[in-house]
Amino acid sequence: MIKLWLIRHGKTEGNKLSRYIGTTDEPLCQEGTEFLHKMDYPKVQAVYVSPLKRCVQTAEILFPGEPVHIIEELAECDFGEFENKNYKELEGNPHYQEWIDSNGTLPFPGGESREGFKSRNLRGFDRVVSGCIRSHVAEAALVIHGGTIMNIMEEYADIQKPFYEWHVRNGGGYEVELDENLWKNGRKQLRVNSAIMELSLIHI
């Protein structure tokens, strides 16, 4: 069995302002950095990250001294016209209202479709799993984005829930396991051990 920790990056200024932060490569905010320094994730054998700064910085704080493997396909969604804006700033935008009315199923204007985003993330996740199997890694961490985690869990979790119900807070995520032999034979499933409640990992 391979154990994976799917961890959402720490908080950024854009997160604090409820902005759609996808391709915008902003760093962690001070609050996010301070919060992560209080957390205590287990040691792992490999760390895989999105190429965006907020994920790389989070990995460096949570797993100091561990080399990180950049997986381009694990990056967050390209929100196109909505990028780096919040719902208040998008009020009155007809494209935004159409997207809301579609329950988030329409492609982001000038950005990615849900299907394209998910397909890209799953390719990246398959690369991670293949790397773990090839290198005999028994426990690894993925420091990625909220949307990326939701795509992976919606597709592979042994508990059936829709995309938005897999949402996690900054610094939180999921502990999952997979059987590498079943995975190699096409039976791709993640056993959900627990949701990572970020507050339970804080040093007192």
Regions found by a protein language model. Give the residues of each.
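Domain-level recognition of soluble alpha/beta enzyme cores
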Residues: 157-185
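A polyampholytic, Gly/Pro-enriched intrinsically disordered region
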Residues: 87-100, 183-198
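Conserved small/polar residues in nucleotide/adenosyl-binding loops
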Residues: 202-204
